[in-house]
């Protein structure tokens, strides 16, 4: 261009107009393509959501802003993984500290570009999977952008797949991390460990004390209680919207879908197929597919082509065999299909086996028993198979279906180790939502820290017996451990007394007016209940002394998962009528304590209100009876334990109450109580009540000992 202009200074340039337009067009197009390539490179090098922005959110930074770190050849290299590491030896729990939410804080290191002395990058661009993993962590409640608050550190160095890694240089990059400290409290994620020809079952990168969330651990490389065994993520099952299939018998009893398996294993499987014919299907790689058909989504048997992973839904059991690596992505595909995995891989540590009960969802068969696998599976009852099919699908939905699910499950396991008193229960890990107790966690464990609120809350259900109510309030207020008194006013046609008329007591007194007159109102989880212990007491129970109530509370503190009460009752089997009978006579046994005066954990208010099986709650409210029996059934069914009757008192008759006031005096009432027991037993599908022949009394009760020296001198008479 310059030469042309110089040689034609006396006239216009000799470039035709159309040619100039075309050149401008191509230059512009080239510029756009170049900018697009630069933008694509920036996106690939930078993972989503790992840098904290000024507003506390997450931002994506330009590749130009990523600092370059040069690693000299003699940079320090961490020691190889310490196989003796356990949480109490290699993890610094003091970095985590105590916090009210019992949540660890996880810090993600900023992205850096590591290069060697020659300027060659140590690793390639961060993979899509690792990008998703970092995003999941940064979007979670665990994430913190303050390195000083962090308990756990996650590098932005992608080691998910060992294949492209430069082992030495990657280890040197890890050692450059600002808080590395021999890998203490650092977490690495790796799904494809090892390299040919040996294919080690754990990441070969030297990592010292760092925790490893690895896919494909063996019993030789897995540090139990320290490392976390995770699934090998399957993009195929994650991208395939495979509808859930109802449990039950399927076309094939046993199916093998893996392609690259050892020839000896394939011979064993083909021998089973030859023996059992159409009930066994052994698939292999397709060799006759049309051009353009994705081979990864097809499997073949002889010349028959099957869609994969859809074909897995046609089988009851699916084999999961070791390949070059011990961990296989096919496990995720099998679980998604609701096919029960038959794991034939000796020494394999199943994913999340620290918390997941794999006996409920899989069958593990030793490799030497592979020829007997068909007969082994035939011995499993059909009902159990269907439960395993449901459980397999549930495991995939909860823990396998996405990188996010894998990341959060890993962090939860580590969190449970650090805060064991707030750990997720076995049921919460393993029970599908249809059978677990929903969002409120069961607090009935051995606590490692004291409850936030001591004492108990007394809940008095009343309708219009004001004089008796005031006497109950006065007596209960004398109990030293009383924290609050809550009156549930169940009368919609009459206002409660004016505030000035209520007894003056030392603890807060709150009146709650209900919208409807229901007995179940006494078991509602009111926000005003701040203590763990609840005393349910009727407005006519005026005979209990403060010593009796205080002793009952202290017994409950020793057994917080029990119903601890005073009026004892019994259920009996009537052989003549062939049904259950309610018994209120004095006997040597009890199986219930009435909630007219009983202590229990406030957790059961939640279960009673929101999780009571069947129509029991509506039955109680309709018949205006048996709410106490329903609570006894509920507690016994949840805990599997009997009630505890305290103190010898058996008479709970209100001296001023007439026969009209006292429902228990009516013979019809007793018949209805028997009907309730039979109704509830039918709904629960069992009789959960446990019969016991003992009660709890103070140690010095009836001993010839000075009353002044007894802790509970006024226990009272029968």
From Swiss-Prot:
The record lists glycosylation at: 288, 637
The UniProt annotation places Mn(2+) binding at 540
Q: Which Gene3D superfamilies match?
A: Spore Coat Polysaccharide Biosynthesis Protein SpsA, Chain A (3.90.550.10)
Q: In which tissues is it expressed?
A: Expressed in heart, brain, spleen, lung, liver, skeletal muscle and testis. Heart shows a high expression.
The entry sums up its family as follows: Belongs to the glycosyltransferase 47 family.
The protein's role, per its UniProt record: Glycosyltransferase forming with EXT1 the heterodimeric heparan sulfate polymerase which catalyzes the elongation of the heparan sulfate glycan backbone. Glycan backbone extension consists in the alternating transfer of (1->4)-beta-D-GlcA and (1->4)-alpha-D-GlcNAc residues from their respective UDP-sugar donors.
Name of the protein: Exostosin-2
Give the species this sequence originates from. Answer: Mus musculus
Q: What is the lineage of its organism?
A: Eukaryota, Metazoa, Chordata, Craniata, Vertebrata
